[in-house]
Design a protein with these regions (language model features):
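Start-of-domain marker
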Residues: 21-78
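Sequence/structural signature of outer-membrane beta-barrel proteins
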Residues: 48-54, 74, 82-88, 116-122, ...
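Residues that define the transmembrane beta-barrel architecture of outer-membrane proteins
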Residues: 25-29, 59-63, 90-94, 125-129, ...
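Predominantly the C-terminal beta-signal and adjacent terminal strand-loop region
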Residues: 147, 158-211
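Repeated loop/turn-to-beta-strand initiation elements of outer-membrane beta-barrel proteins
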Residues: 39-45, 73-79, 105-109, 141-145, ...
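Residues on the lipid-exposed face of transmembrane beta-strands in outer-membrane beta-barrel proteins
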Residues: 31-35, 65-69, 96-100, 131-137, ...
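Cleavable N-terminal export/targeting peptides
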Residues: 1-23, 210-211
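Detector for outer-membrane/organellar transmembrane beta-barrel domains
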Residues: 99-102, 106-153
Length: 211
C-alpha cells in the first residue's frame, strides 16, 4: 500500500544505520508450541537460544510458558513466565499484560502493553513496563510482513524513565497448516539510563507449531 512506503523507508534507514554502528550482533532462535483450550484460553510453550559476541558465544537459553485469554475479538490478556539460564547465573521473569489488534485488511494494527518483573539471586528485582506497536501487512495467504517499535520503561516509586527501545522488521511465512516460520531483524539500544548505552543488531528465526 502506497501510504506505507514512507514508513518502510524510514524504518529501513534507521535499521541500516543500526547495522553499521552497532556494538554487537546477536542471533535469536526459538521453537514454539501453541494450543487453544476451552473458554477462549490459549497456552503457549517457547524454547529459545541466544548468541552474542558477533553470534559466536552463548548468551542465554530460556523456557517460557504463557497463558492468554481473549476477552473480546482482538483483545487479550496474558501472563508469561520465563526461566532463563545464562553462563554464570539464572533469572526468573513473570509478566502480565494485554493487547488489542485491529484488522483493516490487508493491514492489521496491534498495541501491546505489559508489566514485567525479573528476579535474580543476590540482586534487587527489576521492574519494567513495555509498550509495543506493530503493523502487519498480509502479502498473500502464506506471507506476511511486519514492522514494530517497542519502548522499555524503568518502573519504581522514584522514576519512570526510558531504558531501552527496539525497532524490528520481519516476515511470517506459513509453511504448512498450523506451522509458521518467522524471520526478523531487530535494532535495539539498551541502558539508556546509564552513562554508556549499547547498540545491538539482532538477527532471528523462529518456528511455531499450532495444535
Amino acid at each position: 500500500m502506497k501510504f506505507l512506503r514512507p514508513l518502510y523507508k524510514l524504518v529501513f534507514l534507521i535499521l541500516l544505520q543500526g547495522i553499521n554502528g552497532a556494538d554487537d550482533t546477536e542471533s535469536h532462535s526459538s521453537i514454539g508450541f501453541e494450543t487453544k483450550l476451552p473458554y477462549s484460553i490459549e497456552l503457549e510453550l517457547d524454547q529459545g537460544l541466544r548468541l552474542k559476541d558477533q553470534m559466536s558465544s552463548f548468551k542465554q537459553t530460556f523456557t517460557q510458558v504463557s497463558i492468554a485469554y481473549e476477552i473480546i475479538d482482538g483483545m487479550k490478556i496474558f501472563v508469561p513466565i520465563r526461566y532463563a539460564i545464562f553462563e554464570d547465573k539464572t533469572k526468573q521473569r513473570i509478566s502480565a499484560g494485554g493487547s488489542y489488534k485491529y484488522d483493516l485488511k490487508p493491514l492489521s494494527f496491534k498495541y501491546r502493553s505489559k508489566f514485567q518483573i525479573t528476579f535474580e539471586e543476590n540482586e534487587p528485582s527489576r521492574e519494567l513496563v513495555r509498550n509495543k506497536f506493530s503493523i502487519d501487512y498480509k502479502i498473500n495467504k502464506k506471507l506476511k510482513s511486519y514492522i514494530s517499535g517497542e519502548v522499555f520503561h524503568l518502573y519504581d516509586l522514584d522514576q519512570y524513565q526510558y531504558d531501552e527501545y527496539r525497532i524490528s522488521t520481519g516476515m511470517n511465512v506459513s509453511i504448512k497448516k498450523k506451522r509458521q516460520l518467522k524471520i526478523f531483524y531487530t535494532y535495539k539500544i539498551e541502558d539508556l539510563t546509564k552513562s554508556s548505552t549499547n547498540q545491538i543488531n539482532i538477527f532471528g528465526i523462529g518456528y511455531n507449531f499450532k495444535f
